[in-house]
Amino acid sequence: MGLLSLYNETSGKVSWELYRFSIIYITISNHTNIERRSDLKIVVGVKQVPDSAARLVAVDGKANWGDSPLIINPWDEYAVEAALQQAEANNGSVTAISIGGESSKEALKHALAMGCSDAILISDEALAHMDSQVTSRVLAGGIKKLGDVDLAFLGRQAIDTDTGLTAAQTAHLLGWPALTLVVVISNIDTAARTIKVERSAEEGRFTVSARLPAVLSIVKDFGEPRYPSFMGIRKASRAEIPVWSLADLALGELKPTVSWPEIMNPPQREITTEMITGATPQEIAETLADKIMAEKIL
């Protein structure tokens, strides 16, 4: 089009065509810079669970934790720590999200006290019974509503259900890479939109790279989470935490695909203890070996 104008039109027409092209080029460049911003927008999922010292018992086929206090899921503290480290290194922000009732705000306040910028509670009566798939759909909906999220961090698993599926399922619903069991975050290139991590495995560690955005689950070998600071605790205590419903996330009826119709206590086992004595260590060892062979343990 420009060459045709140069051949047939006046020089004023040609100059206008070149000038218009320059404007288009600058607009595209600016748009690209917006898409590849240098800061990171991070989400971390946290859950309110019974204290790790609590004992689960079955009462009338239902799980009962007694009067155990509620705490932030210990695995999620490692996820919060990982998220905060990346935010600090990349001029980013961290928003904590929890799904549950009013008491779940305590887990969010713990995350705020550790250093998270914001917190959001997703609560709805329809979420009284959830499995990992429902949890993942709600979490993915919250991430989509926030918009422009680069990284989502989750703990390895929750200590009350121990499924360890939420990170992978959330990544699948978002269409993002799932980087699970992360021990080290080696590099994040905000310009190239890539991340490199080390994953824990029985065979050792694997180095994996992926495109952003991505979902990560963090294991405790990542490093000890920081303690909430005094100023952080004060700030968190005054924080107004917004509450989103399923309607806010444009999610319809969510039905769990897995149900727990009944929970049973394991049968009681009778355990007896016998002290083996002898005049010498060799005699004791021989007696122990005879008993092990007699019981066919080996």
Could you tell me what each predicted segment is?
Residues 7, 19-21, 25:
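Aromatic (phenylalanine/tyrosine) cluster motif
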Residues 25-26, 32-298:
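N-terminal glycine-rich FAD/FM-binding segment characteristic of electron-transfer flavoproteins
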